[in-house]
């Protein structure tokens, strides 16, 4: 049995009649959805072995030494949308690259596959080549408040910022959760961000309907947070590459898992359970396409590694993460915001160097291929873990997004049909 994820705080309010539908990782709002609320699993538990490299012990971004993840999940209210009040299905997820990252900066690089969205702070990363504060993920309209939370947390730890020290431009990445959440309410508070950062840990990472992923939809199913990692053989340096995603992208017919066209076959998948074929597999697409601003979705990909890479190489890793995204079926549609940010803990960039020069270890480009492969594999698996870890959610106006059915997946991914890479 996997270790219990830590670094996650949930704020969930439910009526007594619906209390059984509440869970720390999400809330269905309804307990009658056949078998979709059975115990959630990770992709590997379904027999998927994505690529050739082995995962780290946690198969998570926190396998990279020093990296921490924290969540705050907000689930309150039900029924019709009351703008500014609820229902609330949202949250914040933070990634802390290392302790004292302000003084021990990490090399970083970013890539924007399609720019219908926002990740703040990228101009300074491109200019400086490093990252010097935590990364936060949230919903689109909550970006300014979440940035305030990151700033407040940093000011508490480094009171000289803006007085005797430099200022900062936080990195906050967004996806639109407005189909399930009262996004106008901007319910993630400054205090929520501080809690997420204070509670961030290096242990197992909660996935699916948690933190920034609480209101996300991916490939026509409940999406959200997913993570995975790869550890290179000693001959390739023994480095670890970890990925965390917030998956809010894709259309159901596009979904591919382990080479199997799951999205196309899902509605008629045979199972040995009580799950009946979906009588109207297009109902989700019709309702989503008819809603404003949320027809094509987005994905945020955070890549961490202890390989000693510079900003240019990390930007290259961000580009390769797009290949892992494509393996799951995504085509980076016109209205999708697909942002990749990579950082390395393999070097320390000092805050104010006392000498005019300092030394960094650098992995030769000719030895980069294994790291590239690991990034592609971990990105693909992190997306699938987001899907298999998510739980069904009923949000504003009674809109319901089903979690992908584990029994149907087992049938589709059985040994006689699964395509192995």
Task: Walk through the language-model features, giving the residues of each.
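Short intrinsically disordered, low-complexity coil segments enriched in acidic
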Residues: 1-3, 23-24
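Bacterial N-terminal signal peptides that target proteins for export
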Residues: 2-14
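Residue-identity detector for glycine
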Residues: 7, 26-29
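Bacterial N-terminal signal peptides
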Residues: 13-21
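Polar helix-capping/helix-linker motif
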Residues: 22-23, 415
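Alpha/propeptide regions of enzymes that mature by internal proteolysis
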Residues: 29-421
């Amino acid at each position: 049995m996997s270790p219990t994820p830590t670094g996650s705080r949930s704020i969930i309010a439910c009526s007594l009649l619906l209390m059984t539908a509440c869970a720390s990782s999400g809330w269905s709002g309804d307990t009658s959805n056949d078998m979709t609320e059975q115990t959630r699993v990770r992709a590997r538990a379904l027999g998927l072995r994505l690529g050739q490299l082995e995962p780290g012990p946690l198969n998570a971004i926190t396998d990279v030494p020093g990296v921490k993840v924290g969540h705050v999940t907000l689930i309150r209210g039900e029924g019709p949308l009351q703008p500014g009040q609820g229902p609330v299905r949202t949250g914040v997820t933070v990634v802390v690259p290392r302790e004292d990252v302000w003084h021990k900066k990490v090399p970083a690089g970013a890539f924007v596959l399609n720019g219908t969205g926002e990740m703040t702070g990228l101009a300074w990363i491109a200019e400086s080549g490093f990252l010097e504060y935590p990364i936060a993920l949230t919903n689109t309209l909550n970006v300014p408040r979440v940035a305030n939370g990151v700033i407040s947390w940093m000011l508490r730890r480094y009171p000289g910022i803006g007085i005797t020290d430099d200022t900062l431009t936080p990195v906050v990445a967004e996806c639109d959760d407005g189909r399930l959440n009262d996004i106008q309410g901007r319910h993630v508070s400054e205090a929520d961000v501080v809690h997420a950062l204070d509670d961030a840990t290096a242990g197992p990472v909660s996935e699916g309907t948690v933190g920034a992923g609480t209101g996300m939809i991916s490939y026509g199913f409940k999406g959200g947070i997913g993570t995975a990692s790869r550890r290179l053989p000693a001959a390739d340096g023994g480095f670890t590459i970890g990925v965390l995603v917030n998956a809010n992208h894709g259309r159901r017919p596009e979904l591919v898992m382990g080479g199997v066209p799951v999205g196309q076959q899902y509605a008629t998948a045979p199972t040995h359970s009580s799950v009946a074929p979906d009588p109207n597999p297009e109902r989700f697409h019709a309702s989503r396409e008819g809603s404003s601003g949320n027809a094509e979705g987005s994905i945020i990909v955070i890549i961490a590694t202890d390989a000693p890479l510079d900003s240019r190489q990390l930007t290259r890793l961000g580009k390769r993460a797009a290949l892992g995204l494509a393996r799951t079926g995504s085509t980076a549609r016109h209205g999708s915001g697909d942002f990749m940010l990579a950082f390395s803990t393999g070097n320390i960039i000092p805050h104010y160097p006392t000498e005019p020069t300092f030394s960094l270890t650098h992995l030769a480009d000719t030895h980069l291929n294994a790291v590239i492969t690991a990034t592609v594999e971990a990105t693909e698996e992190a997306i699938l873990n987001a899907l298999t870890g998510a739980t069904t959610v009923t949000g504003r106006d009674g809109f319901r997004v089903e979690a992908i059915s584990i029994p149907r997946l087992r049938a589709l991914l059985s040994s006689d049909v699964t395509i192995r890479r």
